[in-house]
Amino acid sequence: MSVRLVGLDFETTGQDPASCGVVQAAYVEWREAGAMAGAWDEEQAEAVVCNPGEPIPLGSTLVHGITDSAGADRARAALEREPTIITAEHHHFAAFAGQLLGEIERDDGILVSYNGAGFDLPILERHARRKLAGRHVDVYRLHKQSSAAATPCEHVKGGWPASLFKASLAAAHAFWTGELFDGAHDALVDVRATLRTFAAMLEHPTAGWTIEAALRATTEPLPGDVDFDGKLRWDHEGEAVWTVGKNAGILLRDLDAGFLRWVLNKDFHPDTKAIIRAAQRGQYPTRKTTPT
């Protein structure tokens, strides 16, 4: 059976995957084009505007151009163009999240996202009320792991803007394909850009990516991180250090016992919690060193 990639992207009311609402969902299916190496056929593509069931902050509207009737006038003034306005006729994402999850899993599909491991996938699973039973490639994590060692495309068409954030989808797309793209933060545009970026990674002469390697890398911590989400990082002496909030910069072994209990009661990644539980027992992670 040929490889089937399913790209997914959401535009939302905020940045917290545990609570934000979905205002646009896009899904694109690519299938390997027969015996042609590196060739893919787009078989399905759909983008749906969704009613998040909550007010849409102006700051979010400025990113994706979607608002509700209550915020329409402010959005017009801020955007200087007509926004997409959500009405009561638009369905809540939860109405079809389960169906979408099943469609991704069909025919052994591989979910492809950009920072989906930390954002889009938790949102989908929260609304579908179950976990993904299939495979997932997070192109963001691949880019972070390999862009420093790989050789970028020699010429980025249109020039490389100095303001381009190196971890953004736009930067990853430019790095691997040599092209900029218009319309970022439209979910359908972003999905296609993500798939193009992944396809270029697979064909890159020095990066060494295969689909199986990409699947493995999606489940591993990024370079320098102790845990999957990067809440803990290695310092120059090989000690684990907490990275966020008021305790940022404090060694794991020096964190207050009450703070460790707080982490375990909050919505942190299971990998992070496993390390914290070990720390409560006086067991701290040790950085592996490469023999010289």
Locations of the language-model features?
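Hydrophobic/aromatic-lined pockets within catalytic cores
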Residues: 128-129, 147-151, 177, 196-206
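Conserved non-catalytic scaffold segment of RNase H-like nuclease domains
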Residues: 1-134, 152-185
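Acidic, divalent-metal-coordinating active-site segment for phosphoryl/phosphodiester hydrolysis
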Residues: 186-199
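Acidic two-metal-ion nuclease catalytic site recognized across multiple nuclease folds
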Residues: 197-292
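Conserved beta-strand -> loop -> alpha-helix junction used to position metal-binding or nucleic-acid-contacting
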Residues: 132-148
